[in-house]
Amino acid sequence: MRMKKPHKSLLVILVLSFGFSACNVQKEFDQKFGDQHFKTSVALIELHRVRFGEYPNSLKDLKFTGEWDQIALGSVKYKRVANGYELDVVKGWVGKPELSYPDEFWKGLGVVRSNMKP
């Protein structure tokens, strides 16, 4: 008795299923990495203000950062403004994450504008 070859449609379904699950994994990783990069950047910027009395002119002015911090800082766009700073997340893991934080998160921070802020 001859074994039948797998149907092409089954193969297509498997490939599509894998593709869709990979997209979900990427979106989840973008969220997780984007969140971590944003919070790390905020912490480093706010620490700079505590130490030196003002926000840095650029992210290159941050002192005593670690190698992993550079990954986070490379995922955000920073601009110092008169009354604080603007901080946007430009990259999560691969793509741009869609994040939001409650009003309480922003209290006491110098972030005056962000693509993560409502």
Where do the model's predicted regions map?
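Low-complexity, acidic interaction segments enriched in glycine
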Residues: 31-39, 46-118
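Sec-dependent N-terminal signal peptides
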Residues: 9-18
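Bacterial signal peptide processing site
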Residues: 24-26
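Bacterial N-terminal signal peptides that target proteins for export
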Residues: 2-10
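C-terminal motif of bacterial Sec signal peptides marking the signal peptidase cleavage site
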Residues: 20-22
